[in-house]
Amino acid sequence: MSIRDTLKGGKGEVIKDPRVFIDPLTVFKDIPFREDILKEVAVAVRYFVKSDVKFSTLFLGLTGTGKTFVARYMLNEIEEVKQEDSDYSKVKQAYVNCREVGGTPQAVLSALTERLTTDEVPKHGINLGEYIEKIKEELNGKKALVYLDEVDTLIKRRGGDIVLYQLLRADADISVIMISNDINIRDYMEPRVLSSLGPTVFFKPYDAEQLKHILSIYAEYGLYRGTYDDNILSYIAAISAKEHGDARKAVNLLFRAAQLASGEGFIRKDHVDRAIIEYEQERLIEAIKALPFHYKLALMATMDAEDVVTAHKIYSDLCNQYKQKPLSYRRFSDIISELDMFGIIKVKIINKGRAGGIRKYIEITDKDKIRKALEDTMNLGFEEQW
């Protein structure tokens, strides 16, 4: 297929509407296998709007189990109901992905205040309480429903608990839905925050049959008829079910496989296999970008070291360069072990005998990709990482 034919589309095209994969809320009129959760949240929202009963809840589940999708769906439904029920006209909503805005208490509250008020909000120079006061002034009799996605990145930061506590205990009609894939997130919360927190909603992983059903909806609306078959959907669903039932992965694999099949008219197994390889590479990059600051420094140090001892020396030099206090060799070694566990690097332990002792050697297969991912993130404001 020539470049011109590809640009024009038509012959052998597989994807009918790419928007289905990019913004599925335009297609889904309900969310399969999450109806009970949606109803539970809808009841809480109704009591909040109509009976002044504030609530807070935590959406907890592994990646790709529908937490963000349910939150986004509920946000959209509430906006639609505003046209039908005047009680909802005074409800303001704000969705913030804590990781994407930086994760610090200052960054999260700044983003939240911007979304709930009409004023331009400074990201520095005012204390956390002032953000809350700005929100309260803006509401002035109205209600606010706040969605904090990837809230674990906030909770694990110094002062992150203060943000939640102030929101949950604010003298204003604010209800909060928090979203996290860290099943141990409650361990990072202070007792006063836990006592203010409402029930936790657990999102169970999808099984292969459920994933196949979800994929069939995406395929029906997003792909041309006859460009895929039942076996392809089953294959993708089975692969994704093995990894804690990740619907996001399943949908991404189907979309990428369809892109690879463009011009050929049909999605084959080898298209899916290629999509899997690309997906794993992209996930590696995202994992690196999400690492804490000193983990990134440790990883950067391994790029030019063959063993852990040498890497620690390079790491210490990097800490001096970035005006950070180096972690001890023992803690650094623990971080290297964690990076090994994450699959980012590989550590090989070799016993050199009585004279040489035990040495930990470092092996890295994707140095270029890791370097690029580090370069993209190492220009962040490190003073905010601690």
Curated annotation (Swiss-Prot):
GO molecular function, one term: ATP binding
Keywords: ATP-binding, DNA replication, Nucleotide-binding
GO terms for biological process, alphabetical: DNA replication
Binding positions for ATP per the UniProt entry: T65, G66, K67, T68, F69, Y206
Gene3D superfamilies linked: 1.10.8.60, P-loop containing nucleotide triphosphate hydrolases (3.40.50.300), Winged helix-like DNA-binding domain superfamily/Winged helix DNA-binding domain (1.10.10.10)
Nucleotide-binding among keywords: yes
Family: Belongs to the CDC6/cdc18 family.
Record-linked HAMAP family: ORC1_type_DNA_replic_protein
Cited function: Involved in regulation of DNA replication.
Protein's UniProt name: ORC1-type DNA replication protein 3
Gene source species: Sulfurisphaera tokodaii (strain DSM 16993 / JCM 10545 / NBRC 100140 / 7) (Sulfolobus tokodaii)
UniProt gene name: cdc6-3
